[in-house]
Amino acid sequence: MTDNLTRAFKELLNQERFGSQSEIVDALKKQGFTGINQSKISRMLSKFGAVRTRNTKMEMVYCLPNELSVPNTSSPLKNLVLDVDHNAMLIVIKTTPGAAQLIARLLDSIGKSEGILGTIAGDDTIFVTPTSDKPIDELLQNVQRLFENAL
């Protein structure tokens, strides 16, 4: 296996979020690699410990183990926060697996000065509740600004 093929394979899994081995085969062929077939991709997936997991759109996709590792305080926020959405009552932040509690702790440390009453974090989802005097749109802007500045 060439270094170029290995590098391209890992980049595809890290960036493109492929759901099937045939999609990976097609993508590598489009990049000019020859002799690529499903059985070779299957061996590469096993060799690098790739697993199938759900992305934020609830699609099953291949990921490399380093993407699934527990993030730490040195992980850039841009790599951890996948989506920020809201309704009239709260903000929902989607993160990479394992990152929600780390980010919730950061938000809790900022707390009431930014209009955050509190957070509830699971593995990859955070609920952020505003203080009673903070409009949800203003809190959303504060949270988004925090992630932009920390990127």
From Swiss-Prot:
Pathway: Amino-acid biosynthesis; L-arginine biosynthesis [regulation]. It comes from the Bacteria. One of its GO terms (cellular component) is cytoplasm. Its main location: cytoplasm. Pfam families: Arg_repressor (PF01316), Arg_repressor_C (PF02863). Keywords: Amino-acid biosynthesis, Arginine biosynthesis, Cytoplasm, DNA-binding, Repressor, Transcription, Transcription regulation. It is found in: Cytoplasm. GO terms for molecular function: arginine binding; DNA binding; DNA-binding transcription factor activity. One of its GO terms (biological process) is regulation of arginine biosynthetic process. Belongs to the ArgR family. Regulates arginine biosynthesis genes. NCBIfam families: argR_whole (TIGR01529), PRK05066.1 (NF003457). PANTHER family: ARGININE REPRESSOR. This is Arginine repressor. It comes from Haemophilus influenzae (strain PittEE).
